Amino acid sequence: MSHGPKQPGAAAAPAGGKAPGQHGGFVVTVKQERGEGPRAGEKGSHEEEPVKKRGWPKGKKRKKILPNGPKAPVTGYVRFLNERREQIRTRHPDLPFPEITKMLGAEWSKLQPTEKQRYLDEAEREKQQYMKELRAYQQSEAYKMCTEKIQEKKIKKEDSSSGLMNTLLNGHKGGDCDGFSTFDVPIFTEEFLDQNKAREAELRRLRKMNVAFEEQNAVLQRHTQSMSSARERLEQELALEERRTLALQQQLQAVRQALTASFASLPVPGTGETPTLGTLDFYMARLHGAIERDPAQHEKLIVRIKEILAQVASEHL
């Protein structure tokens, strides 16, 4: 049997006797994907589809975890960025996005506290409204159906891991087994990055405030302890003085009673007045005046007064 001439475009079979379209050719394709890639001039079916890069395509909206749910609020810093970004872009159309963000960050740091508070207040109002809407949404039937669907997707993902691997090896997309459609992949959109930076800045600000408050609290605690010690010391001194005052009052009362009893037998010369507890001071003044007017005449009275005073002093002083 005569063989026809070989076709000009026919390729030689690889070692092992298998054609490229058979299993051996598939192994070669896998090795090329794992290695450095095909040589120059070689084209495979996988070159028709570009290699996927990490991250999320620019401009593509992030998939919502809860469909039809309330939109999450942004911080005051992000509100400021969203308001000022277009103005900066209009004035500087050739300025790249990182430079715009840097300029806005510097502008935010120099912003007056009253202006900052306006954005923070708006963000707080939006946050309160979001929490209210979220609580209402979590009670709805749509939320329950969504959570059930997410749970089913997780179970389906675990069961379809082998099918996903086969799809990747065959070099084409799987409509239902694509990893990006199964997982909620975090994306780095403009809004996401701005919100992340704003949260980090807010955390740094709160940490600084926390440190300042802790220092103030420590100072106030020291002042409080000092004031408490001073108050306790003053209370002790006051109690001591009150005891001393009470003792002196008791001693004074005893002396007045002893003087009243002792001078009861010595009437004032010329008037015959004798002392009582209520009139003791007046009596002693009258007696002193009478003795000063004529000391020589009242020498015996003076001697008696000295004896009484010495006796009272020895008993009560």
UniProtKB/Swiss-Prot annotation:
Q: Spell out the coiled coil positions from the record.
A: 190-257
Please give a single GO biological process term from the UniProt record. negative regulation of protein sumoylation
Cross-link Glycyl lysine isopeptide (Lys-Gly) (interchain with G-Cter in SUMO2): residue positions: K31
Chief localization class?
Answer: nucleus
Give me the stretches of Basic and acidic residues compositional bias.
31-52
Q: Which residues cross the membrane?
A: none
Residues the UniProt record assigns to the DNA-binding region sit at 70-138
Where does it localize?
A: Nucleus; Chromosome
Q: Which residues carry this modification: Phosphoserine?
A: S160
Tissue expression: Ubiquitously expressed in adult tissues.
One short Pfam name that applies is: HMG_box
Keyword annotations for this protein, in alphabetical order, are: Cell cycle, Chromatin regulator, Chromosome, Coiled coil, DNA-binding, Isopeptide bond, Nucleus, Phosphoprotein, Transcription, Transcription regulation, Ubl conjugation
Disulphide bonds in the chain? none
GO terms of molecular function: DNA binding
Transcription among the record's keywords?
yes
Report the superkingdom from the record.
Answer: Eukaryota
Q: Where is the composition biased (Low complexity)?
A: 1-17
Q: Does the keyword Transcription regulation apply?
A: yes
Which intervals carry biased composition (Basic residues)? 53-65
Signal sequence, start to end: none
Annotated region Disordered: the residues are: 1-71
Any idea what job this protein has? Required for correct progression through G2 phase of the cell cycle and entry into mitosis. Required for RCOR1/CoREST mediated repression of neuronal specific gene promoters.
Assembly: Component of a BHC histone deacetylase complex that contains HDAC1, HDAC2, HMG20B/BRAF35, KDM1A, RCOR1/CoREST and PHF21A/BHC80. The BHC complex may also contain ZMYM2, ZNF217, ZMYM3, GSE1 and GTF2I. Interacts with the BRCA2 tumor suppressor protein. Interacts with DTNB.
From the Swiss-Prot or TrEMBL record, give the protein name.
SWI/SNF-related matrix-associated actin-dependent regulator of chromatin subfamily E member 1-related
Upper lineage: Eukaryota, Metazoa, Chordata, Craniata, Vertebrata
